[in-house]
Amino acid sequence: MNITKLLNKVYFAPRLKEIELYTEHAGELQAGVLKRLVRMATNTEWGKKYDYASIRTYEDFKKRLPIQTYEEIKPYVARLRAGEQNLLWPSEIRWFAKSSGTTNDKSKFLPVSKESLQDTHYQGGKDAVAIYLGINPESRFFSGKGLILGGSHSPNLNSNHSLVGDLSAILIQNVHPLVNYIRVPSKEIALMSEFEPKMEAIANSTIHANVTNLSGVPSWMLVLVKHILEKTGKQSLEEVWPNLEVFFHGGVAFTPYREQYRQVIKSSKMHYVETYNASEGYFGTQNDPNDPAMLMMIDYGVFYEFIPLEDVGKENPRICCLEEVELNKNYAMVISTSAGLWRYMIGDTVKFTNNRPYKFVITGRTKHFINAFGEELIVDNAEKGLIKACAATGAQVSDYSAAPVFMDEHAKCRHQWLIEFAKMPDDLDKFAKILDDTLKEVNSDYEAKRQNDLALQPLEIIVARRNLFHDWLDSKGKLGGQHKIPRLSNTREYMEEMLKLNFKE
């Protein structure tokens, strides 16, 4: 028996029996999570403020607590970072996951507790492996090492009490020492802050390793893979790592990168598993290679609620728990966690495709959309359009961003797409038409606004120069880690910055 089969039998397979309970007992599991979270936080400052001691049911919880955004919890975070404790959660909070900012802040700093690390983030990683091994019983996953591509961390500049970093860096820093024997690169290299020297160091330290699995954000992993191929002179990654079998990816949609990965990893035996491990918690794992939807992980330290997308921003939005969601409807996710986030709206939107068990796809961000003219375009629409346009024209998209062009003396309103192609389409006009037509097919509001070109003219595509989006992130100090390109924006702020860089000599 190989080591992978032995570990699976003893350590991972038993967990699958518990995950099977998700199908029939979702409501009970989530009720148990809420009860546990409320009980643990009863004597915190937050728990006393909202009288957690008297909360008995979900309805009590729902009526008592308002929906929170980062602006509401920011004063608590500032106090935690200064060293105060027992504010939002009873255990010590010293780590803060640095996430992309709000309108008023460059970055958000989200509390990370020992419970959220162990029972949510690390449990999510273990379960992803358990699910993968359950699907692939002949795997030799543990015959080699896992390459984990993460961000960096640094001491809090304003205090000696807290440490800040990308979530991935926090996970690497705090992982059980035994895990370091089955992962590469070394912790010192993995936590380097300068992106390009880090890529070089990772390549040098892993080229001769026996890598069987990859974990990271697709965009940044692709940069590393291409660098390794260039450095070794190989045509595909399996020539460097012949035992490579799976890539656990998350952070950004995989769709724009899928074809590029096929070009650099040609093996038909390669597996791709989507995971949803955000700074706020670990929420989902793909459990069927033929279904892009992810299984919602419902027995961690996360209680879920959902706001219909059309109600986001309203004074009294409709809010439902997991058992009340409808299939194929867009919701903004609201979470309460063992890191002390309470009814916190994380900014992601999801759509459920199944409720036995609960499976979902990420459809976008509550702030990443275009609704300048009533068209309500979301990232999920954009991804579907790009898939069709690429398939019909032989194109490969590296990165993209889109924004509205408002009516002026020269032209009517339209959407402007800035696209960096890894492979140009055979016919750019055809690509644009198919993208436009597909958006009409998947979004009736967009179709209505495009009718007879009255409200919206046909979309415009501007070809981005090579490495434009990389350079834009670099200009923001956001290379590597979990930094992302804003796919859709309802204003022109990002687009104008990118266009300026695009035409810069």
Language-model segment annotations:
Residues D105-L110, F369-A372:
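Short small-residue beta-strand/loop micro-motif enriched in glycine and branched aliphatics
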Residues F96-T103:
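Conserved helicase ATPase motor motifs in RecA-like P-loop NTPase domains
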Residues G124-V129, N290:
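Short, basic alpha-helical nucleic acid-contact segments in DNA-binding proteins
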Residues K106, F142-G144, N243-L244, M270:
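Short coil/turn connectors at secondary-structure junctions
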Residues I131-P177:
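Conserved AMP-binding loop of ANL adenylate-forming enzymes
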Residues M1-A53, F61-Q68, Y76-G83, S168-E505:
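Active-site glycine/GP-rich loop and adjacent strand/helix microenvironment
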Residues P111, E115-H121, F248, H271:
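Long, hydrophobic, well-ordered secondary-structure blocks that form the structural core
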Residues E28, G32-F96, K108-V112, D119, ...:
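Active-site diphosphate/adenylate-binding microenvironment
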